[in-house]
């Protein structure tokens, strides 16, 4: 396990998870709306 320094691991996991869910959500929403192909 690498040392994260001042940044707690749970914070990285929370931000990373939220960002991943947002990207996936926008991808499916864009595909459903018909504009996902333009991305």
Curated annotation (Swiss-Prot):
Keywords: Chloroplast, Membrane, Photosynthesis, Photosystem II, Plastid, Reaction center, Thylakoid, Transmembrane, Transmembrane helix. GO terms for cellular component: chloroplast thylakoid membrane; photosystem II reaction center. It holds the Pfam family PsbJ. It is found in: Plastid, Chloroplast thylakoid membrane. Its main location: plastid. GO terms for biological process: photosynthesis. The chain crosses the membrane at residues 7-27. It is a single-pass membrane protein. InterPro entries: PSII_PsbJ, PSII_PsbJ_sf. One of the components of the core complex of photosystem II (PSII). PSII is a light-driven water:plastoquinone oxidoreductase that uses light energy to abstract electrons from H(2)O, generating O(2) and a proton gradient subsequently used for ATP formation. It consists of a core antenna complex that captures photons, and an electron transfer chain that converts photonic excitation into a charge separation. PSII is composed of 1 copy each of membrane proteins PsbA, PsbB, PsbC, PsbD, PsbE, PsbF, PsbH, PsbI, PsbJ, PsbK, PsbL, PsbM, PsbT, PsbX, PsbY, PsbZ, Psb30/Ycf12, at least 3 peripheral proteins of the oxygen-evolving complex and a large number of cofactors. It forms dimeric complexes. Belongs to the PsbJ family. PANTHER family: PHOTOSYSTEM II REACTION CENTER PROTEIN J. This is Photosystem II reaction center protein J. The lineage of its organism: Eukaryota, Cryptophyceae, Pyrenomonadales, Pyrenomonadaceae, Rhodomonas. The gene is psbJ.
């Amino acid at each position: 396990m690498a040392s994260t320094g001042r940044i707690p691991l749970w914070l990285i996991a929370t931000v990373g998870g939220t960002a991943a869910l947002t990207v996936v959500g926008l991808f499916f929403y864009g595909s459903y709306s018909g504009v996902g192909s333009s991305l």
